[in-house]
Amino acid sequence: MRLDIALSELHLFKSRTQASLAIQDGAALLNGEVVKPGHGVKPGDHISLVGPAGTRTCEVLALPRASLSRAAARELLREVTAR
């Protein structure tokens, strides 16, 4: 699944367009690297979101096969950010 679609389907961004812009701006990283919005995501990958409050990193446990609720999407991610 494309990174921009995954970010949107996992409810990390409201839309695929917002996700694409964040990826292009370097605010959304895949496995610690800046990649293109079309880069593939697979279970086990780490998605990092960089913002003013710091960086939040999640491990992808599974990818959605259909549209999910926000609560169901949370079940597909595991927070790995050190607190």
Annotated model-derived regions:
Residues 1-43:
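A basic, amphipathic helix-loop patch mediating RNA/tRNA/ribosome contacts
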Residues 4-8, 57, 79:
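A general secondary-structure boundary signal
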Residues 13, 56-58, 75-78:
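Short, surface-exposed, polar/charged, turn-prone segments marking secondary-structure boundaries
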Residues 27-69:
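S4-like RNA-binding module at protein N-termini
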Residues 64-83:
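Glycine- and charge-enriched low-complexity intrinsically disordered segments
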